[in-house]
Amino acid sequence: MAVVPTPGPKGPRRSLHFVPGGNARMFEKALTLNADTLILDLEDSVTPENKEAARRAVCDWIEQADFGAKECLVRINPQDSPWGRDDAEAIAAARPDGLVLPKVSSRASVDAVDQLISAIEEQNNVQPGAISLVLIGTELPEAVFCLADMAGNGRVDGLTWGAEDLAGELGARAKRNAEGVYLDVFRFVRSSCLLAAVANQV
């Protein structure tokens, strides 16, 4: 099966490079790389006591750095965490190309962030829909059953999957068999994510 790179606002997302939020040295290095997309991370790579400082640093990077042809996405914290809503508000106001939403659970959770961003775009005279959403759609079991619905939000232009958090939710002792092949549940989730993305042309 031929794989077609997912298009973002600045072109195909053939390569994505994660940058820990708040790590200026790694950010400066990332700007010199050939990745199509830089994902500035406020979630897993930032400890709780550094969340707010990292958010401020990432906002400064977005507003001051020259990304050139690189797409700038920011993975914010989950919306049900102590930092999620503040992340969404502050980062959207800084105007990246898009937000990466982890641990989405339903279409309502995606729509809520969409509405928040719409209000910020209006307040700042930004073209409606200019800030996209990329969903990590398989980190919670309940999300797997509404992938297509979540991806149907008009602001969503990317849908991806991950096994790590889902394995934790399931209490799985392993993700792969002895041959290194994903176990059935993870293969099902990965395929479901692909089908939902194609069905919604994201």
Can you say where each PLM-predicted feature lies in the sequence?
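Expand to "…catalyze enediolate/carbanion chemistry for C-C bond making/breaking, isomerization
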Residues: 1-202
